[in-house]
Amino acid sequence: MSESLYPSSTRELAQKRRELTPDTEAAFQSFSQKVFADGALSAKMKQIIAVAVAHVTQCPYCIKGHTKAALRHGASERELMEAIWVAAEMRAGGAYAHSALALDEIQKAAAAKSS
């Protein structure tokens, strides 16, 4: 038996969120609609960006939802995969860049030890 770590997103859960915080839910929905509307960036490009960011934030609901939205807006499989690779490189690059913090601490510890 396979049980998912994340429950399925259902109409019942969406309704419960609306019931618990209706004003906040409405504000978030309005914000989201405005963010993903065509502007300087097309809605398609915004959804591709969202797919990449969702992989960095590791939100399975966001990955699924924004992938579907990107496809609806005309994104290709190749565009989505390239965006995911950009996100992967940025995440790996961040880890690599932050190694400077560890190296700095190593140098401080070595200097303190030798004094």
Outline where the language-model segments fall.
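Acidic, glycine/proline-rich low-complexity segments that act as flexible tails and inter-domain linkers
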Residues: 1-45, 97-115
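Iron-sulfur (Fe-S) cluster-binding segments and ferredoxin-like electron-carrier domains
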Residues: 25-26, 64-79
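Amphipathic alpha-helical segments within well-ordered protein domains
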Residues: 32-33, 50, 67-71, 85
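Residues in soluble alpha-helical coiled-coils and helical-bundle/repeat scaffolds
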Residues: 36, 40, 57-58, 75
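Short, conserved micro-motifs enriched in small and acidic residues
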Residues: 43, 57-60, 93
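Alpha-helical scaffolds flanking conserved acidic
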Residues: 44-48, 77-83
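Short, thiol/selenol-centered motifs that function as redox-active sites or metal-ligating centers
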Residues: 49, 53-65
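C-terminal structural segments of small proteins and small subunits
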Residues: 81-106
